[in-house]
């Protein structure tokens, strides 16, 4: 399963290794799949694959409502699920969920063939809480309960 594996700094690599080492061997009825790049920062489940990528760019809240690459529009509703704040970027082929409140960003891509995409992303929240520390600064106000 091809998944991008950007070069990580030492701290991000340490956090991502902690995240991936604690991921389950299956989520619901979807078994883990082998990834071809960066198994210490990536994972995949099922067919079509739900992917988990650790260490990508951290999206930022932007002063524009239009958004853009790496930019979360100010009027976006963030999802607080199991103590993790997720930004959900809907797409026609997949929904992409990215943590907004963690030291290292974790992105979960859920193909549109799966119903209730947020619930699939939430399958990884407990692992994120246990392995990826909360950021102390720069957390969007929408991430607070």
Positions of PLM-derived features:
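Extracytoplasmic low-complexity, Pro/Thr/Ser/Ala/Gly-rich segments
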Residues: 1-51, 56, 144-145
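Extracytosolic low-complexity repeat regions of secreted or lipid-anchored proteins
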Residues: 59, 63-145
